[in-house]
Curated annotation (Swiss-Prot), chain B:
It is a peripheral membrane protein. [4Fe-4S] cluster binds at C39, C40, C104, C135. Its cofactor is [4Fe-4S] cluster. HAMAP family: NDH1_NuoB. It is found in: Cell inner membrane. This is NADH-quinone oxidoreductase subunit B. InterPro entries: NADH_UbQ_OxRdtase-like_20kDa, NADH_UQ_OxRdtase_20Kd_su. Coiled coil: none annotated. NDH-1 is composed of 14 different subunits. Subunits NuoB, C, D, E, F, and G constitute the peripheral sector of the complex. It holds the Pfam family Oxidored_q6. Keywords: 4Fe-4S, Cell inner membrane, Cell membrane, Iron, Iron-sulfur, Membrane, Metal-binding, NAD, Quinone, Translocase, Transport.
Amino acid sequence: MSPAVLESKAAYDIIKERFGDAVSEFDANPTMPFFEVLDASRWVDIALYMRDNSLLQFNYLACLSGMDYPEEEKLGIVCNLECIGKYTHKLAVKVKCQRDGGSIPSVSCVWHTANWHEREAYDMYGMVFEDHPDLRRILCPEDWTGYPLRKDYKVQETYHGIKVPY
Amino acid sequence: MGLLDAKVSNRNVLVTSVDNVMNWARLSSLWPMGFGLACCAIEMMATNASNYDLERFGIFPRSSPRQSDLMIVAGTVTMKMAERVVTLYEQMPEPRYVLSMGSCSNCGGPYWDHGYHVLKGVDRVIPVDVYVPGCPPRPEALIGGLMKIQELIRMEGLGISREEALKKLAEKSVDAQQVLDQTRKAAIA
């Protein structure tokens, strides 16, 4: 493991110690080491802990992207977390939910950046973020049908009488 | 210059047709609707800037559709924006002209196959008079397109519809390859 990954591992160990089975094993991916939140209902607790623990201080949500896993019948998010200031560790966190009607707790109260990012993930993949203050589509028009980044997405034939496909 | 061909008597009397004067006035003060959609808009702004100086043609962007006679659709028209473009177009008084600038606006550009969110050509929602190809077109190309609009205006007149004017223009059309060959020959010589 490179020094950067070792740093991330050290941060992960603190989280694992506190949350035990709610988080998965550490994946020592050299570009972006990550772990998965197995119990999605504890995601906000974990997020708050990661932000506020003095040894972790993940105060910067660099990115939150959506993911589609059709073979697992799941949707998910990937959060890239960093610390600005005291530490240089980086971690990605994955959270998954059911593909149909699934929901993930919103972390927009933990990192305000998440507000728009979660709206984007909702717009593109269609998972619901519980307790999000303003969950509306952000890129597509309000009355757009379907979620464009799902792997089985089929574009609609017309939108307000305008032909959509080529 | 249509007017300069007209006969001017020694008492400063100018003899010409109403069509001629009206069209000359219209084509010498084109006011494009001032809005841009994507990267082509940067090129459009560059064209309006001092280096290319569109004001020598009397072309100056106007911020209100009610006083514009030309719409330059510069850039990617998304489905979300398409309806707004139509609204702007409908607010413009007639006679109005539309210049579609760049591949995106002409046919969807790089999004023509996989871009679910892009209108595959602005002519699906509003009629287009002149298409300027390119991604994005250089200011020279846009100026070429604007001059084409001016030619179209010159062909129009009282009792001559846009269709007839377009037909007349088509008769005058030159083969692009021929022009290129000539220019190349001239450059070598």
